[in-house]
A protein has these predicted regions:
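Polytopic transmembrane helical bundles with strong interfacial aromatic enrichment
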Residues: 1-165
Length: 165
């Protein structure tokens, strides 16, 4: 862990890290971009998840919802990742030692694995592709898991900003 902390300190103390942290404009721009892109990507993920669990848009085929929203979800996620990386760059050593940061990163990985499993396994099943009703329980579980994971990721991220480190 000490080598990771040393690496984080070098990132934070780099010219870029210092410039972001000390700038009157860059840090707020990156943080604002992070929050806005987070709202886009995870808001649309929630719409998708609500469809998967059968609460909303029941008459719209799952694959239609995914086809329409996927580019915006992925675009928002890329922007969230880039802006979050820039915010992290300015406070890497401070944030990295927090258990909340570790939980956030592990949950992001878990959320990604859940999405990949859904895309490459569950969404390929005939009953999903053909929009059979009711959808298999695996679809609902994937949606519930996604909603839970991403909600906790957001909570961890927001708590990082306010809890002592």
């Amino acid at each position: 862990m000490s080598s990771l902390v040393a690496f984080a300190e070098s990132i934070e103390q780099s010219q870029v890290g210092t410039a972001i942290a000390e700038s009157r404009y860059w840090w707020p721009i990156f943080e604002g971009t992070h929050l806005l892109s987070l709202s886009i990507s995870f808001g649309l993920i929630f719409v998708t998840d609500l469809r998967l669990i059968g609460v909303w848009l029941r008459r719209v085929p799952v694959m239609d919802v995914l086809h329409q929203l996927r580019p915006y979800i992925l675009g928002g996620f890329v922007l969230t990742f880039i802006s979050g990386g820039l915010v992290f760059w300015s406070e890497a050593a401070t944030v990295m030692v927090s258990p909340l940061w570790t939980a956030k990163i592990l949950l992001i990985l878990l959320g990604g694995l859940n999405a990949l499993y859904f895309e490459f396994v569950i969404a390929k099943r005939p009953e999903v592709v053909e929009n059979r009703t009711p959808l298999p329980s695996s679809v609902r579980y994937a949606g519930l898991a996604s909603m839970t994971i991403w909600t906790v990721v957001i909570i961890c991220g927001r708590l990082l900003a306010y809890l002592p480190r």
